[in-house]
Amino acid sequence: MQLAWILWLASVLPPQAADSLCLSATVYLEARDQSARGQQAVAEVALRREESGLWGDSMCDVVTARKQFAPTIVSPRTRLGNTEAWAQAVSIAIESERNWALPPGERKEIVPGASHFMAHAIAAPSWRNAYQVATIGDHTFLRVQRLRPREG
């Protein structure tokens, strides 16, 4: 299946299903070759951004914000062809959403406060000197600014 098809499907699904699909695609594209912990950390960054409201009002808005996550960086024709990795990404996304639905004090956070991450194989972005929260696999997770949950 192609990324373009997944994003189209997300546009016609009910919001909760669409958000799960968008998060799954992001975990797959960003971290399919990483450990489960690395995949959970990627999902956590996306969920933290969604909660902040600074990158959009839904998970699909967050992960399709210009040049923020793989769904807007890779070609829409990118095939998500590894069925085992896709199944793992879906599982990680759903598990991460359940965890993030808990009150903040009860969540299991892997990269506390991280709002960004970078793959070591990619050129370092301008915020590369932010506070490093963790390195998991070939990703470094960073806190660039203090994110506050939106009110209400």
Language model feature labels by segment:
Residues W8-L9, L13-G152:
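Bacterial extracytoplasmic/cell-wall-associated proteins, especially those involved in peptidoglycan
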